Design a protein with these regions (language model features):
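Anion-binding alpha/beta catalytic cores of soluble intermediary-metabolism enzymes, centered on
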Residues: 1-12, 30, 37, 45-154
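Short N-terminal binding/cap micro-motifs at the start of the first secondary-structure element
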Residues: 13-18
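Short catalytic helix/loop segments, enriched in acidic residues and glycine
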Residues: 19-32
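The conserved SAM/SAH-binding core of class I Rossmann-like methyltransferase domains
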Residues: 41
């Protein structure tokens, strides 16, 4: 089976992480008979540098045309002081989450019993190991909202 994957390499460590993830996917494909077609998509600081805005036209459409999106990392200190929303990498994250209808990030936390000594939890808890999945909701509240400033006469 062939899968179309949108690659958003992004900024900072993102290109390296995505590059290594592609190697893993290729190994999985060889073992299980899958093939992958990759489409590179610009988003974040690298998009600001290339086309002047963090969420270029066509980004959502390119991602929607694929079976999955592999996102590296977006943002960094180079772009952290821009005042215009289209020049801030995190606005691209909010936009793509909205446009793709994404609800949550899944953040696994696993502690193997062999690593108990490196954990700040009580020894009797850490020795049992931990296998926890955090679900971080993305669609509402202050986390998702746009930044605005209001000035009053008072």
């Amino acid at each position: 089976m062939n899968y179309k994957i949108a690659l958003i390499r992004g900024d900072g460590i993102g290109p390296e992480v995505v590059g290594e993830a592609v190697k893993v996917m290729e190994a999985i494909g060889e073992k299980f008979g899958h093939t992958f077609t990759y489409t590179d998509v610009l988003m974040g600081g690298c998009a600001i540098d290339a086309v002047g805005k963090s969420y270029p036209d066509g980004t959502a459409e390119a991602c929607k045309a694929c079976d999955a999106v592999l996102l590296g990392a977006v943002g960094g200190p180079k772009w952290g002081h821009a005042s215009a929303p289209e020049k801030r990498p995190e606005t691209a994250l909010l936009s793509i989450r909205r446009d793709l209808g994404l609800y949550a990030n899944l953040r696994p936390a696993v502690l193997r019993p062999a690593m108990a000594d490196a954990c700040p939890l009580k020894k009797e808890t850490a020795e049992k190991g931990i296998d926890l999945m955090m679900v971080r909701e993305l669609t509402g509240g202050i986390y998702f909202g746009k930044r605005d400033r209001y000035q009053t006469e008072d």
